[in-house]
């Protein structure tokens, strides 16, 4: 008769566990998928903050590292170099990067019509609520200088839609305006300090600047600047999509869930997002107001933005931001979104 001591029992259990682990098809706890996601500090990146803050990525076996960038073009450079895996940023730099050979795809949308033109001081009074090419000329004649409008670097969504509004909608002569490229935070500071006459800004900067200076006026909404204005998307490197398809699908599903939460509970969403955008220094009520502002329109479905993106891509070539155009549909991988909504 075989006698089982504590030592032999333990040895048997260890041996059994080792054998089971070696058997094909045995279920084992998978290691978390680690993804580094870049973002621009704007309200349109809120779904990412909610996914991370609510622990939805962790629940799906994904460990996130969030990396902040001051503009889309800078973030795209890091992505093309393999320094980040995914990115929440404007669609324009993603498309421009693809024309230069970067293997990056849009897998979901985040927001549209988020960019506005805001002005203050003498320039705001001079152009009024309906800016015209003549009002730009008159301001220059009266002050002896061109109006300075702050925006982000060439090739970014802010730069692209601003030029569309100025030169296509208002039909301003390019010699009658000075465009000043700068980072997001510097744009807000420069506008409030009077170093700029106007600027392209997004939420929550729109709400913050108007709270700090009620005389800040909106010259154009996102829809007026560029109808169905493409904005922030979720993009990923092809290598990451191939290596972690299930994790990416789960992440897109969580992104959609976050967009839905913003619509249902802007107050609760604001409290979560405040830990990322406000760094605890901004009142959640400010972010809640931003979620309800004219520059806040969240849309997760990438299919819906393709026509407007095609128009934007054609315009980027026209103004020299892109040397060539590519079939826009090729820049989108709809499979992850389509699988997530099934």
Regions found by a protein language model. Name each.
Residues 31, 97-107, 167, 208-223, ...:
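Ligand-binding "clamshell"
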Residues 186-276:
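Pocket-lining segment of extracytoplasmic ligand-binding domains
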Residues 41-68, 73-74, 160-168, 209, ...:
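Short, polar/charged alpha-helical segment
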Residues 103, 110-180, 185, 238:
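A conserved helix-loop-strand patch within extracytoplasmic ligand-binding domains
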Residues 30-42, 62-68, 146-151, 178-180:
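Short, well-ordered beta-strand elements
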Residues 242-323:
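Secondary-structure end/capping motifs
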Residues 47-52, 67-105, 115-119, 138, ...:
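Pocket-flanking alpha-helical
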Residues 50-52, 116-126, 230-246:
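A bilobed periplasmic-binding-protein/Venus flytrap-type ligand-binding module shared by bacterial periplasmic
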């Amino acid at each position: 008769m075989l006698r089982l001591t504590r030592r032999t029992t333990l040895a048997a259990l260890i041996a059994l566990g080792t054998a089971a682990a070696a058997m094909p098809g045995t279920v084992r706890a998978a290691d978390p998928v680690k993804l580094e996601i870049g973002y621009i500090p704007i309200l349109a990146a809120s779904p990412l903050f909610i996914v991370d803050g609510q622990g939805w990525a962790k629940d799906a076996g994904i460990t996130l590292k969030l990396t902040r960038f001051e503009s889309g073009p800078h973030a795209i450079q890091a992505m093309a170099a393999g320094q980040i895996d995914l990115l929440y940023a404007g669609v324009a730099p993603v498309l421009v990067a693809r024309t230069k050979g970067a293997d990056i795809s849009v897998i979901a949308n985040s927001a549209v019509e988020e960019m506005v033109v805001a002005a203050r001081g003498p320039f705001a009074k001079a152009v009024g609520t309906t800016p015209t090419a003549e009002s730009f000329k008159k301001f220059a004649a009266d002050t002896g200088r061109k109006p300075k409008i702050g925006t982000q670097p060439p090739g970014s969504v802010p730069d692209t839609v601003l030029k569309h509004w100025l030169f296509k909608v208002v039909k301003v002569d390019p010699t009658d305006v000075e465009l000043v490229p700068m980072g997001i935070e510097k744009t807000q500071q420069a506008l409030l300090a009077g170093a700029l006459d106007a600027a392209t800004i997004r939420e929550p900067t729109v709400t913050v600047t108007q709270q700090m200076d009620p005389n800040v006026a909106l010259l154009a909404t996102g829809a007026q600047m560029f109808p169905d204005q493409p904005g922030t998307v979720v993009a990923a490197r092809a290598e990451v999509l191939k290596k972690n398809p299930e994790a990416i699908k789960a992440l897109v599903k969580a992104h959609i869930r976050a967009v839905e939460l913003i619509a249902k509970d802007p107050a609760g969403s604001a409290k979560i997002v405040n830990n990322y955008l406000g760094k605890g220094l901004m009142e959640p009520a400010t972010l809640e107001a931003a979620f309800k502002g004219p520059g806040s329109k969240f849309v997760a479905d990438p299919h819906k933005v393709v026509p407007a993106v095609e128009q934007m891509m054609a315009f980027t070539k026209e103004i020299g931001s892109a040397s060539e155009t590519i079939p826009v549909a090729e820049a989108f991988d709809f499979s992850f979104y389509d699988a997530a909504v099934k």
